[in-house]
């Protein structure tokens, strides 16, 4: 059964990340990108999972407020927080902090909480899930870590390693139920949520190449 695009809810990705955009394009459904403005500072005493879930929901709702859609919108929000030894590892922001993160994590097991939220503006319903990925980092030298950072500048990602790029060379093992979660957009969970929201996955009205056009 072919669906009329004009009657479907608008699919929105609440993220400026090109990696999340590339992942969503795999579903071959049209979507638009809206960059949310959300303070990503963890709350005092907040667990890594709680931080990721709260921010994913906040991003989805912030983007939804900026969207006009006659037939409603399904807004995808996501956030990722890394943790080891009970400490949250966020986005480093600078080369120095990124190097310190990688030095602390080498040879260690680290958990990445990839939170996903699907907000349905038609009814106000929210589906939300935290997909956990366990990663073991290789024991690399300071020279190797510094060279990686200068090559890929991963200062805007939790844990200072882009597994979708050269950062895969920092890792010794990955344990996850969803291979896309570590990149930041768990597609297995997302497709489950979209189906629950009644969005057609196998007869989408247009290819992803027609989407991602901004607001």
Curated annotation (Swiss-Prot):
Catalysed reactions, semicolon-separated: N(7)-methyl-GTP + H2O = N(7)-methyl-GMP + diphosphate + H(+)
E.C. designation(s): 3.6.1.-
GO cellular component: cytoplasm
Active site: 79
Protein name: 7-methyl-GTP pyrophosphatase
Entry keyword set: Cytoplasm, Hydrolase, Nucleotide metabolism
Listed HAMAP family: Maf (MF_00528)
Cofactor requirements of the protein: a divalent metal cation
Organism, scientific name: Burkholderia thailandensis (strain ATCC 700388 / DSM 13276 / CCUG 48851 / CIP 106301 / E264)
Keyword hit for Ligase: no
Entry's Gene Ontology BP terms: nucleotide metabolic process
Top enzyme class: hydrolase
């Amino acid at each position: 059964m072919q669906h009329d695009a004009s009657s479907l809810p608008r699919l929105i990705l609440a993220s400026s990340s090109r990696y999340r955009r590339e992942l969503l394009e795999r579903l071959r459904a049209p979507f638009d990108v809206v960059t949310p403005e959300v303070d990503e500072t963890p709350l005092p005493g907040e667990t890594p999972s709680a931080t990721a879930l709260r921010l994913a929901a906040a991003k989805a709702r912030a983007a939804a407020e900026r969207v006009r859609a006659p037939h409603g919108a399904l807004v995808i929000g996501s956030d990722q927080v890394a943790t080891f030894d009970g400490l949250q590892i966020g986005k480093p922001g600078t080369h120095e902090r990124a190097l310190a993160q990688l030095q602390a994590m080498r040879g260690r097991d680290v958990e990445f909480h990839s939170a996903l939220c699907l907000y349905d503006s038609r009814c106000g319903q929210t589906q939300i899930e935290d997909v956990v990925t366990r990663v073991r980092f290789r024991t690399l030298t300071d020279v190797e870590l510094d060279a990686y950072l200068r090559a890929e500048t991963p200062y805007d990602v939790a844990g200072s390693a882009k597994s979708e790029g050269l950062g895969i060379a920092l890792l010794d093992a990955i344990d996850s139920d969803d291979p896309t979660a570590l990149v930041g957009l768990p597609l297995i969970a997302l497709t489950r949520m979209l189906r629950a929201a009644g969005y057609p996955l196998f007869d989408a009205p247009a290819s992803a190449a027609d989407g991602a056009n901004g607001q």
